[in-house]
């Protein structure tokens, strides 16, 4: 775990991380345990526990979660099946994404995620519209 992320976790007394495959990208997501608990509570608050489909959604969402501990040297062991899910073979890259950390195969981040022109246009659209949902 890179030092800047470790410092933030230590400052917030986070000792465990929740690991999950990203829903949309070929990467893994590390949540500080408190952030994961908040996100899980939000999801559960939107689900009806008496609706079988909602129970399937919750089950699917939490089924691939792994709890990781960070050792004294800032290391954590990511299980092999997660590395395979994210196509990670050698070098990895950590990307801070607001209140969570994405873990990528470095070779997947060597190119921009979006073409610069597409990115600038999309960002302009998001930042200049009253409803930022498209």
Language model: regions and residue ranges:
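Short, Lys/Arg-rich amphipathic alpha-helical interaction segments
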Residues: 106-134
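Helix-adjacent hinge/juxtasegments
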Residues: 29-67
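Short conserved catalytic/interaction loops centered on acidic-Pro-aromatic/His motifs
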Residues: 84-106, 112-113
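Beta-rich strand-turn-strand
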Residues: 66-75, 80-89
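A positional/architectural concept
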Residues: 3-27
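Short, basic amphipathic alpha-helical segments that act as recognition/interaction helices
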Residues: 21-28, 33-36, 100-109
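Charge-rich (acidic/polar
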Residues: 13-19, 55, 87-88, 92
């Amino acid at each position: 775990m890179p030092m800047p992320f470790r410092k933030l976790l230590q400052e917030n007394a986070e000792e465990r991380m929740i690991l999950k495959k990203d829903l949309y990208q070929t990467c893994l997501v590390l949540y500080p345990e408190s952030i994961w608990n908040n996100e899980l509570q939000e999801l559960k608050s939107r689900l009806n526990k008496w609706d079988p489909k909602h129970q399937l959604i919750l089950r699917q969402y939490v089924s691939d979660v792994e709890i990781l501990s960070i050792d004294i040297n800032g290391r954590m062991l990511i299980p092999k099946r997660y590395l395979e899910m994210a196509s990670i073979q050698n070098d990895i890259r950590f990307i801070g994404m607001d209140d969570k950390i994405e873990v990528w195969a470095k070779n997947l981040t060597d190119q921009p995620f979006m073409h610069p022109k597409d990115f600038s246009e999309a960002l302009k659209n998001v930042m200049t519209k009253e409803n930022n949902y498209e």
